[in-house]
Amino acid sequence: MAKKKSKDKAGSNTIAMNKQARHEYFIEDEIEAGVELQGWEVKSLRSGKVNIAESYVYVRDGEIFISGMNITPLQAASTHVVANPTRVRKLLMSRKEIDNLIGRVNREGMTLVATTMYWVRSWAKIKVGVAKGKKLHDKRTDSKEKDWNRDKARIMKSSLR
């Protein structure tokens, strides 16, 4: 009798992360979306050749798209397919989720940011964050808080010795 495969941790299926988004924006909510991909793009994702740091998500004609996501084509890709690494890709969500995002972006002055790309079984998914931009003083406050937490941990560690 064959053993069942143990379920992987969510972090182990991560393809790419946008760490810059947490620095530049207050992310209030995250929603999972599928991505419309071509065959060569899936192969490149499996080898980890993707960058979502410079990507942005926008709404057009009641649909949500991601632009600026760079998927580098493999050398062994098919010769009869023209690979465009930065093409605009459609994000796949339910109509209810799309309407909710459109309403929040238009009404509350929020923006949409791609935060993480990961695998769910054999499908590539993107977490889209509903975010508000940080001002310079917000970034300074975050930096001070991060430094204080680091110093606090250092003090606690030395006091336990």
UniProtKB/Swiss-Prot annotation:
Report the GO molecular function annotations.
RNA binding
Q: What is its main location?
A: cytoplasm
State any GO BP term from the record: trans-translation
Q: Where are the transmembrane segments?
A: none
Q: Which UniProt keywords apply?
A: Cytoplasm, RNA-binding
Q: Where is the composition biased (Basic and acidic residues)?
A: 139-154
Q: Which domain of life is it from?
A: Bacteria
UniProt cross-references to SUPFAM superfamilies, sorted A to Z: Small protein B (SmpB) (SSF74982)
Question: Where is the segment annotated Disordered?
Answer: 137-161
Where is the protein found, in the record's own terms? Answer: Cytoplasm
Name the GO cellular-component terms.
cytosol
Entry-linked InterPro entries: SmpB (IPR023620), SsrA-bd_prot (IPR000037), SsrA-bd_prot_CS (IPR020081)
**Family, similarity comment:** Belongs to the SmpB family.
Briefly, what is this protein's role? Required for rescue of stalled ribosomes mediated by trans-translation. Binds to transfer-messenger RNA (tmRNA), required for stable association of tmRNA with ribosomes. tmRNA and SmpB together mimic tRNA shape, replacing the anticodon stem-loop with SmpB. tmRNA is encoded by the ssrA gene; the 2 termini fold to resemble tRNA(Ala) and it encodes a 'tag peptide', a short internal open reading frame. During trans-translation Ala-aminoacylated tmRNA acts like a tRNA, entering the A-site of stalled ribosomes, displacing the stalled mRNA.
The name this protein goes by in its record: SsrA-binding protein
- Organism, by scientific name, is Aliivibrio salmonicida (strain LFI1238) (Vibrio salmonicida (strain LFI1238))
- The gene name reads smpB
